[in-house]
UniProtKB/Swiss-Prot annotation:
InterPro entries: IV_Tat, Tat_dom_sf. Its main location: host cell. Keywords: Activator, Host nucleus, Host-virus interaction, RNA-binding, Transcription, Transcription regulation. Pfam families: Tat (PF00539). It comes from Simian immunodeficiency virus agm.vervet (isolate AGM TYO-1). The gene is tat. This is Protein Tat. Residues 76-100 are annotated as: Disordered. One of its GO terms (molecular function) is RNA-binding transcription regulator activity. Transcriptional activator that increases RNA Pol II processivity, thereby increasing the level of full-length viral transcripts. Recognizes a hairpin structure at the 5'-LTR of the nascent viral mRNAs referred to as the transactivation responsive RNA element (TAR) and recruits the cyclin T1-CDK9 complex (P-TEFb complex) that will in turn hyperphosphorylate the RNA polymerase II to allow efficient elongation. The CDK9 component of P-TEFb and other Tat-activated kinases hyperphosphorylate the C-terminus of RNA Pol II that becomes stabilized and much more processive. Residues 43-53 are annotated as: Core. Interacts with host CCNT1. Associates with the P-TEFb complex composed at least of Tat, P-TEFb (CDK9 and CCNT1), TAR RNA, RNA Pol II. Interacts with CCNT2; the resulting complex is unable to bind to TAR RNA. It comes from the Viruses. One of its GO terms (biological process) is positive regulation of viral transcription. Residues 26-42 are annotated as: Cysteine-rich.
């Protein structure tokens, strides 16, 4: 066995050990070609766009100050419509009904 074959066997063993290790997270946010291909995890995430978890979305908080007065009002006043008719509208209805 010469020196070249021994180095090749050692490098082969190093590579097989590297594949047995779990993938380590990379803190690099760069998407250049060098950074995308420097490790298997970066290639999957940056180069191919594969993610194994969905990004967390934040829900918008509802302001409790605006909802507190609305909860104590009736439904008809919340939307700006009165459920009861006013005396002037009743008079208009009577006059239009009487003219027909």
């Amino acid at each position: 066995m010469d020196k070249g074959e021994a180095e090749q066997i050692v490098s082969h063993q190093d590579l097989s050990e590297d594949y047995q290790k779990p993938l380590q997270t990379c803190k690099n946010k760069c998407f250049c070609k060098k950074c995308c291909y420097h490790c298997q995890l970066c290639f999957l995430q940056k180069g191919l766009g594969v993610t194994y978890h969905a990004p967390r979305t934040r829900r918008k908080k509802i302001r409790s100050l605006n909802l507190a007065p609305l909860q104590h009002q009736s439904i008809s006043t919340k939307w700006g419509r009165d459920g009861q008719t006013t005396p002037t509208s009743q008079e208009k209805v009577e006059t239009t009904a009487g003219s027909n």
